[in-house]
Regions:
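Long, C-terminal-biased catalytic regions of enzyme "large/alpha" subunits
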Residues: 1-178
Length: 178
């Protein structure tokens, strides 16, 4: 992967001229990731999913562990990018202070300078209670009429407000237990 990114970086610099420059970043914004996958399919490319993500790994792959994700978003690779290299570290639940400290050390060691921890939150559609855990029932009123908050491209948003393709993608995401 580093070889490919290095090649892209080389040609971006080589063909840069006044009024024309090229950029390489991981940024399929909410609708762009869906549109690019659709356009690639229409152009005959093999597209395994309906939505591209801004990561160097498949978000639903349970075999890519948290430490590897920090490596993949570390200096070795992002030094070839000109922007948009955020890691959304999807976790099943909040960590202890010591566990967060350990991951911050990993991020520093790997040179992963742009990341956030992403833990789904539960929103009760009946009483409005928000819980910082992924729950099946509201702890305040007992309702099962729930929605969830997670990151779509960097900010927390109700999953029900994602585009349809992003809702499908969000349902496939793997949230690691640390």
């Amino acid at each position: 992967m580093e070889e490919i990114l290095s090649l892209i970086e080389k040609y971006n610099k080589q063909y840069k001229k006044p009024g024309l420059m090229f950029n390489c970043e991981m940024i399929p914004a909410e609708n762009v990731g869906v549109k690019h996958a659709k356009w690639d399919k229409e152009d005959g490319f093999k597209v395994p999913r309906d939505c591209y993500n801004s990561y160097f790994y498949v978000v639903e792959n349970q075999n890519t562990n948290v430490l590897d994700k920090f490596k993949l978003h570390g200096e070795r690779y992002i030094k070839h990018l000109t922007g948009g290299s955020a890691l959304h570290c999807n976790l099943e639940e909040h960590l202890t202070q010591d566990q967060y400290r350990q991951l911050l050390k990993v991020a520093s060691k790997e040179g992963c300078n742009y990341f956030t921890f992403n833990i789904p939150n539960t929103v009760c559609n009946d009483c409005g209670h928000i819980d910082k855990r992924y729950l099946k029932k509201c702890p305040k009123c007992g309702s099962e009429n729930l929605d969830y908050l997670t990151r779509v491209i960097g900010y927390m948003k109700r999953v029900s407000n994602f585009s349809q393709a992003r809702q499908v993608e969000a349902s496939k995401r793997f949230y690691a237990k640390f």
